[in-house]
């Protein structure tokens, strides 16, 4: 939705670090968030004007900026916004140079500046990358299978777990739908696939999903964080997945303590007789119950 958001995105240069910052104060649920782009090289030029970067009728395959010695330094409001940095590096024959570009988003300006500072420099970036490698080696190595079919081994030993965690749990994305919502049924299914690799994530998803149950027992079929807007529907198989996921978790880990965790209920109007569903932001009920009681209800 670049065209609809472009008029409200304001860009600036952070005076302390020189990083480029961008925010959209009209994004109701994310108005405090600040995106940033930084580089380990201090000698750089930049622009936050997409028209300048690409050129009129230009493309990402052949942007106009590649023909320019420097970018203008244009920032502010009223642009077709982007974050672009240009760094010139001269290399002698056989010489190499490491550059680090950091691109991310903070919860607010203070958080963005903290992240910029944390990942400044090649050393910090290498340490972060080593941490990422260690995490994935540990997580993807939790389960190992060997079958007569090499292609199945390739999928099962790493790739499917990676896809489930990165795409389904973190990105809430799929081949046919990339909406970013939590699905009551879908993410419980996904989290169960991680019971051996990331059991804490399954436990967290059980408690999170229980908190999206209405007092009457039905649930939000899907919802968007952080506010929790979503749909209340007549879909009936949602009822099955919370007790099934709890049974899978307790059976695999013998952690019966999850049954005593407490989660709130939601309050909202019932689905009308002539409706299949409706989209709304429900209220948080003052009533809470244990995970076991949520499963029973």
Specify the residue positions occupied by each region the protein language model found.
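Aromatic-rich carbohydrate-recognition surfaces in CAZymes
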Residues: 194-202, 206-297
């Amino acid at each position: 939705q670049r065209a609809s958001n472009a008029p409200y995105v304001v860009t600036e240069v952070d005076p302390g670090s020189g990083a480029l910052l961008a925010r959209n104060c009209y994004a109701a649920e994310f108005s405090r968030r600040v995106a940033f782009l930084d580089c380990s090289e201090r000698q750089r030029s930049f622009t936050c004007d997409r028209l300048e970067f690409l050129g009129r009728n230009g493309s990402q395959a052949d942007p106009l900026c590649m023909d320019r010695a420097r970018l203008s330094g244009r920032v502010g409001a009223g642009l077709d916004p982007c974050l672009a940095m240009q760094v010139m590096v001269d290399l002698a024959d056989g010489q190499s140079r490491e550059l680090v570009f950091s691109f991310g988003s903070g919860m607010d300006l203070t958080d963005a500046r903290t992240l910029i500072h944390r990942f400044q420099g090649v050393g910090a970036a290498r340490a972060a990358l080593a941490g990422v490698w260690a995490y994935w080696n540990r997580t993807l190595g939790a389960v190992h299978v060997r079958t007569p079919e090499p292609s199945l081994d390739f999928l099962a030993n790493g790739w499917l777990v990676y896809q489930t965690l990165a795409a389904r749990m973190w990105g809430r994305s799929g081949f046919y739908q990339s909406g970013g919502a939590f699905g009551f049924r879908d993410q419980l299914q996904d989290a169960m696939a991680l019971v051996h690799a990331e059991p804490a994530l399954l436990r967290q998803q059980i408690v999170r999903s229980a908190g999206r149950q209405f007092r009457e027992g039905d649930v939000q079929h899907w919802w968007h964080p952080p506010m929790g807007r979503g749909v209340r529907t007549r879909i009936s198989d949602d009822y099955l997945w919370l007790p099934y996921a709890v049974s899978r978790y307790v059976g695999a880990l013998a952690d019966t303590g999850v049954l005593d965790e407490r989660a709130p209920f939601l309050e909202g109007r019932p689905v009308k007789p002539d409706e299949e569903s409706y989209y709304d932001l429900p209220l948080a009920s003052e009533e809470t119950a244990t995970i076991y009681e949520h499963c029973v209800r």
